[in-house]
Amino acid sequence: MIAIDFEYNNNRLVCVCCKKSDTIYKFWLADNSDTDAFKKFVNDNKNEIFCCHALEKAEGQAFQRMDLDPTDYKWYDTYTVESIKTKATNLVFRENSLFEALSLVALEQKYLNKTSDETSDRSKHKHEMRDIIIADKELDEHKTEILDYCAEDIDSLEQIAIQQCKDYAELVEKYKAVKTFNLKLENFQKYTSYEQWMTIFVNLCHAVAIYSKCAYKGLNINDKALKIIAKKDVILENLKRAFNDKFKTDAFVFEQVVIKGRGKTKSAVTVNLHGKKDSKILDYLASQAESEIQKIHNDFIWPKSDSGKFKLDKETLKSYCICDTEFAKDLSEIETFRSGLAAVENFDKTLITHPCHHMFGAQTGRCTPKPTDGFLPCMGQLFRSFMNPRDNEHLLVSIDYSAQETAIAAAWGKDKNMLWCYQQPDFYVAAGYKFGVIDDMHATKKTHPRERDKCKLLCLTSNYGQGYKATAKLLNISEEESKDLIKKYTDTFSGYSDKRKRLLYNCSKSLVPTVLLTDDGMPYVYIPEDSAKNCKDKDDVQHIHKFFHCKSKFFCKPSTSLGNAPIQSAGATMLRYIINRLNEENIDLVCSMHDEVILNLPKESWKEQADRAIQIMTDAFKNLYGQDAYIHVGEPEVAEFNGVLIPHSDRVIPRFKKLIEFGVFSENDVKIE
């Protein structure tokens, strides 16, 4: 293994240090004097594993600046591995104080038993050196000092990597419980070697190297459109006018607020009505609707979440909002549009934003960036129209699965009824027919909208293991009706439901922590609630504390997260397969999200490359569930750039028309064909 670390002066490479065995190699890159020597060094050691911290943002970018393809090398990224492990505490632990930083200094304290004083001194020294490195001075004056500082980081990288892998090996060795999500017992002795875990994580980090290439190329953004939406005051004024006109009042005053949370900043639209400040638009609508409906139905209560807040998803608004349905949907779209502006403000001034793929921020490896993280493609289809191809010779092509999670659930559970419903034009209508909620075999979304919505919510909540009480609140029905509906679901989709129950039973009743493996070997650590509550062995408690590097009396995972883990982990496995194959075939990946890839394809040959990508996506599913397994890949959505804003699909055109109506854009700004 070779530990490697770069130092930057803003976007300029300053130096790199490498440690192989006990020898440290230092290369000065600020004046390119050692660039060729470094390139020769890495190429001479191509068979070694390069160990780094934050591959996508640092080493991957640096390699490409020197015309080195990061996917030609084997990587171990301590940041990615720790992210998978510690982000899992979101489901394991209940207190924010248990979350640990993922910086290299924090990892040194965790894995190398550094004291608080040592960590504090180290952090102070790093800040002092960073001030020297990024200062607008001649770096050659501090060359020796900077190189020595760079070498300090690599001294601990290899030790951290080995200890990360040993943690998994020791957990398996102690509890001897390794299974796949299909409940097949694995040879646990194979996984008591830290070298085996090293191999698993090196394979994982190959996908991170591919993503570093996406980040290096960046994402082109429509400059003109950004300047338009930057005029927030104009948008708020027009939103206020449209809303007041709708309710024939002038009482509404709209404000843009910024909410700062743990590591995140998001933007929200609030309404100040009759002196009541910070009331969200949709909360106001729900409260108003509840009062009006209670005049007719005394016992009506607007559906609420477990925390007691109004449910404000589109389906609930559509069902109960007293203003017309389309306006409720419009408000929801405007709310999403406005909340995205905080992220837009964080875009790079060059109008190129590097897509930060957080797909490894969950133990399943399946995690998508949120709109407030500044990841444009996740801001809904409306915001996707702000993306441009890399140049006028290319097109942006978006390809995704149709109801991927349903197809995975049907294949995983070998559920014939679920597969039949999936193969119909509308899964939820077909499911409603199977449940007996819809009596017309030829029903459609338009003919039975309410019944379909009920079946959709039932399927989604049941897939995530929601109980009858929560389902009753969500659907606004009695608990007895909820029990009956859930029984219809489990009886109809018995293949999937029974498989899920077996997984929950086998893991939660095992009374010991279990390492579940995804189809490509990724670990998912499950600690049953009973084992945590009944654990009297202090050594067991300490061992689990050590694994997660935190202290807590409780370290159990809810069964709902475990029940959905096979679906999410399979989706992550498929995505890793897809991006690896796209990279092998030189198909230009711009970014990926959940079950979708966005490609930058040549105008002349985009259809051929899109067809190849569709075949790769189909192969990813069949590799998991056999050649007879069925999944549908949607038709590609194509977008080009000709200087104005062009909606990418028919589904967002009505939203742009509404934005024009609300005064966000003029008809000259948007081309709607």
For each predicted feature, which ranges?
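Extended, well-ordered alpha-helical scaffold/bundle regions in very large, multi-domain proteins
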Residues: T192, W197-D324, T461-L504
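Short, conserved charged micro-motifs
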Residues: D36, E604-R612
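Conserved catalytic core of nucleic-acid polymerases
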Residues: A209-Y216, V437-D588, S592, E635-E673
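Active-site-proximal helix-loop-helix substrate-binding element of RNase H-like nuclease domains
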Residues: N11-V14, D22-S33, E48-Y168, K179, ...
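Catalytic palm active-site di-aspartate
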Residues: D153-I154, E158, A209-G218, A225, ...
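Mixed-charge, glycine-rich, non-catalytic linkers/tails in nucleic-acid processing enzymes
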Residues: S123-F252, G413-Y422, D426
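Acidic, glycine-rich two-metal-ion catalytic cores of nucleic acid-processing enzymes
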Residues: I4, N9-R12, C17-D22, F252-K446, ...
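A common structural junction motif
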Residues: F493, Q615-Y625
